């Protein structure tokens, strides 16, 4: 009896590409390591910047890990995991975005030889998670609680440390005080929306200003604006979301009249409605009127005659910050303006900053707010300074809440690495080797800081290992003297939350990538979305497990 040939079982649509097994896992690791190499040189006080060219008018210069990862527009599905953890670190803590990406890449690189030797990924995952828990416990044990009387100094040092690797590092003392002033003005909830950062080209970084209140750039104005008061004590502020302007209706406007003489009565009625709105605003007793929509020339002249200030087309975030700071509420009508919706503060004034005029509300009683006006030469430079200040504000915010600190400069990573190495000697089997590999991977932070500063990283690491073996737990890389030093005594401090979050996020990303053993790629879906296509040569390289490494040197 002849053997029947069974037809193959088709589970996926034609054109669907699948890659699975160890080669696919190694390919994902190679892709992630290639991404890590892109941001590796941005770490530390001597880290380099990246110039990302998107279009003729959109150029970004940054060494912020989250910004660089976001602008790279990575399409590899496994490598996008690193983008996600960088964004998570940025939103959760504000700093350490480059560190978390480098740590994840180093953990994957440490796992690669074990995979090639045939160790199951789940064994590696369990060992790495165990090492992560031990690292968390050690960091919490080493962290130093800050006393309330030293809180100001502590916050300034944390802000200064986060600026060490930024373009504004030369002005870190100036900006660290500014950042701490801004955060300490806020209430215990520390809502970052109450800190506004404005950018004004011209001058230098040292010309930047801190304002203990809400401020926004003067909006477009009409004739009569120059006659309005620009300095008002204890102002009464009304915020609107209506248009105070007479405009000629061109679309969807139709009037049907039987008698041409009635046309003037319609015009008079329109003017009466308009002036009724203005009179209602004046009758409410306010003397500062802000609106998200336009305030026309007629309304501007009316308010000037009544000795009132007005500003139209105020940006949404600015008018909301003014409302929260002064206690005002945005109104969509002028028919029912009650005292409860009117805000106040100690002083309203208009001041000159560079080539622009700014409207300032200071002495706000309802909710404290702050505004930082950044000055600088180039647009890209000011944008990077804004990102740097955002990171520093996030760090100070977290430090104020958690009030525990560890030494920076790679000191905490070296101490945790030593602890894990000692612990691995007390256990047996594969777990010992895996925890030891995890410990060695942590040393990438001080090693990369030294490399980026142009030091001999091998010599630096040997010195650090010797010091930590002698019980000097706070020794890290000394950028100033090209060696090592006690970074805690040198006031190079970082909130312990930054280090905890970095190691946990990097470990989870590593475990996620190690747990994926198959990739299914639907080419038809890609064509429908007009996404990037993968040619046959690239697909063959990925299926053989060589990934990105296989394509190097072919460009």
Swiss-Prot record:
UniProt-listed CDD domains: TCP1_eta (cd03340)
The keyword ATP-binding belongs to this UniProt entry's keyword annotation: yes
A GO MF term: ATP binding
GO cellular component: chaperonin-containing T-complex
Keyword tags: ATP-binding, Chaperone, Cytoplasm, Nucleotide-binding
Single Gene Ontology BP annotation: protein folding
SUPFAM superfamilies for this protein: GroEL apical domain-like, GroEL equatorial domain-like, GroEL-intermediate domain like
Signal peptide: none
Presence of keyword Nucleotide-binding: yes
One Pfam family per UniProt: Cpn60_TCP1
Location of the protein in the cell: Cytoplasm
Subunit and partners: Heterooligomeric complex of about 850 to 900 kDa that forms two stacked rings, 12 to 16 nm in diameter.
Biological role: Molecular chaperone; assists the folding of proteins upon ATP hydrolysis. Known to play a role, in vitro, in the folding of actin and tubulin.
Record family assignment: Belongs to the TCP-1 chaperonin family.
Protein name: T-complex protein 1 subunit eta
Species: Dictyostelium discoideum
